[in-house]
Amino acid sequence: MLFEGKVADGPFPTLAGPGIALIPSALSHRGRLLEILATPQVRRWWDAPDQPEGWPADDPTEPDTVRYTIALDPGRGAEPTVVGLIQYAEMNVPEYRHAGIDIFTDPAVHGRGIGKASMRTLADFLFAERGHHRLVIDPAAANAAAIGCYTAVGFKPVGLMRQYERNIDGNGWHDGLLMDLLPDDLG
């Protein structure tokens, strides 16, 4: 389980990228992250904004998921501004070693490269430090902004997963796009 940035083989380091820091998620980030999840732009694509008690530092429904809080890098001594969350789960079978990634960011920072910087920073870590061969992500097929961000980082479409995920309102299903990234694709 994840406790203040620690998992079974943690703790995990803070990761620095251009203009951002990925900080191991802590309970102190919960309020701000729930605010971001509740925005209509994020809510459209993510599960309900009500998360289990202890989330994002500890989520008993996803004990193998590692979460990083995305923060704007304020420079020396200043408090970082929380603007989103990026998470991964690992498949540690040697023949299929890969990780799946999910991300959401505050709509106020959309279009500023924060998502791309966060994805590249986490991808670098997962390839170089965690030894993964492939990364995967599965946005809703209609989420053009997310797909554009992931494509800019180097993710390639693998295929359409029909009726992949239940709609937020619980009525019906929508398609997902499976995308993957190999180390040589990272842009």
Map each language-model feature to its residues.
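A short, well-structured alpha-helix characteristic of acyl/acetyltransferase catalytic modules
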Residues: 1-57, 184-187
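Conserved catalytic-core motifs of GNAT/GCN5-like acyltransferases
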Residues: 25, 136-139, 156-172
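Acetyl-CoA-dependent GNAT
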Residues: 44-110, 116, 125, 182-186
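Short amphipathic helical patch at the helix-1/turn junction of helix-turn-helix
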Residues: 105, 140-141
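Conserved active-site alpha-helix within GNAT-family acetyltransferase domains
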Residues: 116, 128, 141-159
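Conserved GNAT acetyl-CoA-binding A-motif
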Residues: 128-138
